[in-house]
Amino acid sequence: MKITEKDFGQGYHLITLENKNKLVLSVSDLGARIVRLKTNDQELVLGFDTAEEYIEKDPYIGASIGRTAGRIENGRFSLNEKTYQLAIDPKTGHNLHGGSPGFELKKWSYVILNGENEASVIFTTTSPDGEHGFPGTLDVEVRYTLTQDNIWRVTTRGISDQDTLFNPTNHVYFNLTGDASQAIDQHELWLNSEAYAPLRADSIPIGVKENTAGNAFDFQTPKKLASVFASDLDQKELVDGIDHPFFLKESGLDKEAARLTSPDKKIQVDIATDASSMVIFTANFGPETPEMRGRKLAHHGGITFETQTAPGAERFSAFGSIHLKAGSTFETVTEFKIKTREE
């Protein structure tokens, strides 16, 4: 497989993998992030051209997120009968994505593995004991793999020397038009989910699983995202789109979890994961959006599939567990299969 490395600015690197079908994956040691995913020279994900732009404009785009993706209410959690206070995000009043700067702004070490059927970039970092208030020294590995059969695989591992919380994800945004100035409203979405987590006004889950049957968040039959944006569902109105955890009916790499199709039906992304839920966020940024590769990012200009345990699991056991025991290895895998259809 073809592999190139180049300078990404600010002391960071850009590593590009290209398979026999000309599917191109570019990743960086800035935040162990995906920067590009291209098929036939068409861009499939949002991103910037330099490390400096990520740092200045939006460090979460495409990045590895952790220690804990999403919000932890008031930055407080209890573990083994002890209460911990985490760093508070001033905008939300809660802990956001584990605290800032988090995984998204770390300079990760990396090695490259190249094989006949696939190539990988393996990023590693260590989050020290007490970072942003979390207990335990946590060693983290994020492995990005590109296969010859057009799968981008994300494998995340973690091991801590103390009991702690760990709920990582990847914050890639898809826009299959290749044009960040176009909204994703004409993309078609299917989800293997019949329940989601409603939110309070401050985007904290209220702690219940609500059935999606018959409402705007029901994607069990494929439909265009425009139908959601046009709906009057109160949860859609709350965030001006989608920014919610969806609980998967089935997990596993042999089970399709989600499917996103381009407006012209020529590109399809099939997603499989061993995670129990995914946070779907439709880039509800309003008019204040950055310029991205020469174009101003549209409101609703991308969509995330943040595979993880649902935020709030530290308080709501029905959501799952994000408790990582000392010495135990956490691992989660998500696969994105890129399918293209010619005229």
Where are the language model's segments positioned?
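An exposed, glycine/acidic-rich loop-and-rim segment of catalytic or binding clefts
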Residues: 1-343
